[in-house]
Amino acid sequence: MAELACFCYPHLENDSYKFIPFNSLAIKCMLTAKVDKKDQDKFYNSIIYGIAPPPQFKKRYNTNDNSRGMNYETSMFNKVAVLICEALNSIKVTQSDVANVLSKVVSVRHLENLVLRRENHQDVLFHSRDLLLKSVLIAIGHSKEIETTATAEGGEIVFQNAAFTMWKLTYLEHELMPILDQNFVEYKITVNEDKPLSESHIKELIAELRWQYNKFAVITHGKGHYRVVKYSSVANHADRVYATFKSNSKNGGMIEFNLLDQRIIWQNWYAFTSSMKQGNTLETCKKLLFQKMKRESNPFKGLSTDRKMDEVSQIGI
């Protein structure tokens, strides 16, 4: 995750702003600079290489002292920064909006995936600039639309029906912020269209998840799509979701946290997010993740007989 101010800076033109991507040498200069505390939140002028991000964001970049940040000297950093600028320059950002826009925390990996989709000549985003920019504006939280299959970050499609598409996320192969744990496995499920779904299509998805992904929990980050994650990573997701929810609540103007379909979501996660929305503490909410829940009656009669027992997947073992 990183603020948009880590990728670009605003330049006032008439009554709105044009956004310009940082170059890696300007960032490198900022990372070595001594800056007064009162100037930590201001864009840094490297004199030689142009404007650099505010020094308060130093930890967002990979250095000898911090291996958890972005690999800003890669070509992918420049591609992501340029893509963000293209999207921001396609809309009007006024002086009253600019600080709020640049403070938005975004998923670096999501944006890298959109670059990869853009470069794939078989992908619809390669052929449609409007759809590409729409996808980026959704990714950076500047649109109230949800991420659907067409505007999704992408990955490897492992399941699809008339209503849903399930993607295996490819973060292990990333340049900018790769996942270093080689055991990482995670999926995302997007709706093909933002409209009411038929019961039969929901039933197909639940059957697929129950039999092929029975070692995983289905959760949501509240943005209109599902995530399918290892049970061992659920607590980590809970910390991130709670922190983001609280931050958005504090800053105001947040998009409503979408609990999604209770029949698809893991029961304990639904309890966690419901408790979070009620304003309870992180400790209180997280207790629900490890509490034994009363099993719900099967919402779809006959679902358990859709697959034979010998078809149960070994994925995740």
UniProtKB/Swiss-Prot annotation:
E.C. designation(s): 3.6.4.-
Q: Which HAMAP family match?
A: ROTA_NSP2
Pfam family example for this protein? Rota_NS35_N
Could you tell me what this protein does? Answer: Participates in replication and packaging of the viral genome. Plays a crucial role, together with NSP5, in the formation of virus factories (viroplasms), which are large inclusions in the host cytoplasm where replication intermediates are assembled and viral RNA replication takes place. Displays ssRNA binding, NTPase, RNA triphosphatase (RTPase) and ATP-independent helix-unwinding activities. The unwinding activity may prepare and organize plus-strand RNAs for packaging and replication by removing interfering secondary structures.
Q: Which domain of life is it from?
A: Viruses
Q: Where in the cell is it found?
A: Host cytoplasm
What are the binding positions for ATP in this chain? 107-109, 188, 221-223, 227
Q: Name one GO biological process term.
A: viral genome replication
Instruction: Write the protein's name.
Output: Non-structural protein 2
Q: Quote the SUPFAM superfamilies the UniProt record gives.
A: Rotavirus NSP2 fragment, C-terminal domain, Rotavirus NSP2 fragment, N-terminal domain
What's a GO cellular component annotated to this UniProt protein? host cell cytoplasm
Q: Which UniProt keywords apply?
A: ATP-binding, Host cytoplasm, Hydrolase, Magnesium, Metal-binding, Nucleotide-binding, RNA-binding
Q: Which cofactor does it need?
A: Mg(2+)
Q: Where are the transmembrane segments?
A: none
Give the span(s) annotated as RNA-binding: 205-241
GO MF terms here are: ATP binding; metal ion binding; nucleoside diphosphate kinase activity; ribonucleoside triphosphate phosphatase activity; RNA binding
